[in-house]
């Protein structure tokens, strides 16, 4: 076997092994997307009813709360960026990071200081490489987030917005995450999470023509709001974590499918080259045999004379 043919066969074996790996990763990502979508659907009724309850308390009373009160002058903002712990997801992380940087630039242009909170190792690696300050970091759960993870993330953020800016607090909280639209479309978006605009929440939760019930609050509207608002923030962060997880798995599936298809095309190309090399080798051997036979025939004819 010629040296060139051996090289082609070795490359075909290597690419075939890679194709098997990418195909397996594609199938795993596809199953995880389905699980993440189910979790989003399962959490929706709870989030909807919680939103209605918060709206009822906020709009049905004159209660003021730190999480719903807009500062007269906003001097410091917090940005929560949701990325993944792992790569191999195409432009998933880079799009989220780009959206966060654009939001940060916009807030700084308005004269605000920005504290950055990050979920996921990929986002942390980006900021650490550029020596940018990260106020707090959470990792290890981005593939399959739970409500407990959302609660862990929400705690420091709620504490920060309840503090005065002079004591290290912030005036508002923005979140940047990737919204799952479909298996083929995922969009990095930013949204202001706190302080909560009760009017916007009421519009989101209301159905046209719906008659809203009247509520009595015990022991008081203030106590109910104190209990509900942190749960509302946790549910919003949990939904964003689930959306990001589904988007990441969809991006991984798409990237691995592309890699599998490219590997198949490369195997076909290498197979054609290997066949051409084999044919050239066979042709060379036949030429050598014919040439040798011809020379032998000429030598035999000469000796007969």
Curated annotation (Swiss-Prot):
This protein's source sits in the domain of life called: Bacteria
Q: Which residues form a coiled coil?
A: none
Report the record's Gene Ontology biological process terms: proton motive force-driven plasma membrane ATP synthesis
The protein's matches in InterPro entries, at most eight in alphabetical order, are given as:
ATP_synth_F1_ATPase_gsu, ATP_synth_F1_gsu, ATP_synth_F1_gsu_CS
Which Gene3D superfamilies would you find in this protein's record? 3.40.1380.10, ATP synthase, gamma subunit, helix hairpin domain (1.10.287.80)
Q: Which SUPFAM superfamilies match?
A: ATP synthase (F1-ATPase), gamma subunit
Q: Which UniProt keywords apply?
A: ATP synthesis, Cell membrane, CF(1), Hydrogen ion transport, Ion transport, Membrane, Transport
Q: How does it sit in the membrane?
A: Peripheral membrane protein
The UniProt entry's GO CC annotations, sorted and at most eight, read: plasma membrane; proton-transporting ATP synthase complex
The UniProt GO MF terms for this protein read: ATP binding; proton-transporting ATP synthase activity, rotational mechanism
Q: Does the keyword Ion transport apply?
A: yes
Pfam families xref list = ATP-synt
Tell where it localizes: Cell membrane
PROSITE patterns referenced in this protein's UniProt entry, alphabetically: ATPASE_GAMMA (PS00153)
Q: Which family does it belong to?
A: Belongs to the ATPase gamma chain family.
Q: What does this protein do?
A: Produces ATP from ADP in the presence of a proton gradient across the membrane. The gamma chain is believed to be important in regulating ATPase activity and the flow of protons through the CF(0) complex.
Q: How is this protein organized at the quaternary level?
A: F-type ATPases have 2 components, CF(1) - the catalytic core - and CF(0) - the membrane proton channel. CF(1) has five subunits: alpha(3), beta(3), gamma(1), delta(1), epsilon(1). CF(0) has three main subunits: a, b and c.
Q: What is this protein called?
A: ATP synthase gamma chain
| Annotated source species | Streptomyces avermitilis (strain ATCC 31267 / DSM 46492 / JCM 5070 / NBRC 14893 / NCIMB 12804 / NRRL 8165 / MA-4680)
What broad taxonomic lineage does this protein's source fall under? Bacteria, Bacillati, Actinomycetota, Actinomycetes, Kitasatosporales
